[in-house]
């Protein structure tokens, strides 16, 4: 029996059905790697980020996520170099898709029960995405901006529905706007923590006491 088309599982019709002690025998997700490229370089290296954003509420299979990751990764290696980017898949397939197998050969009417007990068995995994949710993000240096847009465009061909490519206003994968990053770093308002940053806030009695004495 062939694999059921992904269009059968495209829409979010019911509640999420994750793997649990009641839902056993779930096959492994096809996608196992969510970060590609220079994933260990810190936040200072790649200031520019582009997102592939979903414009529909739908389910995306783990096979499609893996195909999109491979497509974008190969294009970036070929056109920008393997040390010039960092790709991150932003959604994870936790929803279990079920199938009620039906025999279609001659004489099958004596072997199957039709819709009696039709709950189905686990068949695959999918990610449930909402409108405006990023599916994939790539951070690079400014000279590779055109290559990133083309890579995300090719990755979008692997997904159903509508997606848009958007340029992030943040520096890399951080939560600091690009125009503030260099200034805040010189002022010591945050410290670099891998691909992200840790904002240093004044809190606690010691800082409060210093402000009172200064006043």
Swiss-Prot record:
Please name the SUPFAM superfamilies in this protein's record.
Answer: Ribosomal protein L16p/L10e
Database matches in CDD domains = Ribosomal_L16_L10e
MF (Gene Ontology): structural constituent of ribosome
Which InterPro entries does this one have?
Answer: Ribosomal_uL16, Ribosomal_uL16_CS_euk_arc, Ribosomal_uL16_dom, Ribosomal_uL16_euk_arch, Ribosomal_uL16_sf
> What family name appears in the similarity comment?
Belongs to the universal ribosomal protein uL16 family.
Q: Which domain of life is it from?
A: Eukaryota
Query: What's the protein called, per UniProt?
Result: Large ribosomal subunit protein uL16
Q: How does it assemble?
A: Component of the small ribosomal subunit. Mature ribosomes consist of a small (40S) and a large (60S) subunit. The 40S subunit contains about 33 different proteins and 1 molecule of RNA (18S). The 60S subunit contains about 49 different proteins and 3 molecules of RNA (25S, 5.8S and 5S).
Pfam families in alphabetical order: Ribosomal_L16
Q: Gene that codes for this? A: RPL10
Question: Could you tell me the keywords of this UniProt record?
Answer: Ribonucleoprotein, Ribosomal protein
PANTHER family assigned: 60S RIBOSOMAL PROTEIN L10 (PTHR11726)
Which cellular components does GO assign to this protein?
A: ribonucleoprotein complex; ribosome
Give GO terms for biological process: translation
């Amino acid at each position: 029996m062939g694999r059921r088309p992904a269009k059968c599982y495209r829409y979010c019709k019911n509640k999420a059905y994750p793997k649990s002690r009641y839902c056993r025998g779930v096959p492994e997700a096809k996608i196992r790697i969510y970060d590609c490229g220079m994933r260990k370089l810190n936040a200072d290296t790649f200031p520019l980020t582009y997102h592939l954003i979903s414009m529909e509420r739908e389910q995306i299979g783990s096979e499609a996520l893996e195909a999109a990751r491979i497509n974008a990764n190969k294009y970036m290696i070929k056109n920008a170099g393997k040390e010039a980017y960092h790709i991150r898949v932003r959604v994870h397939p936790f929803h279990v898709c079920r199938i009620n197998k039906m025999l279609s050969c001659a004489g099958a009417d004596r072997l199957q029960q039709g819709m009696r007990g039709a709950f189905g068995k686990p068949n695959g995994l999918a990610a449930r995405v909402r409108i405006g949710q990023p599916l994939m993000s790539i951070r690079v240096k400014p000279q590779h901006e055109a290559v990133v847009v083309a890579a995300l465009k090719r990755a979008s061909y692997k997904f159903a529905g509508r997606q848009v490519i958007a340029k992030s206003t943040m520096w890399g994968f951080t939560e600091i706007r690009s125009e503030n990053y260099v200034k805040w770093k010189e002022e010591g308002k945050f410290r670099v923590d891998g691909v992200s940053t840790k904002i240093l806030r004044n809190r606690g009695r010691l800082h409060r006491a210093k402000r009172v004495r200064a006043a």
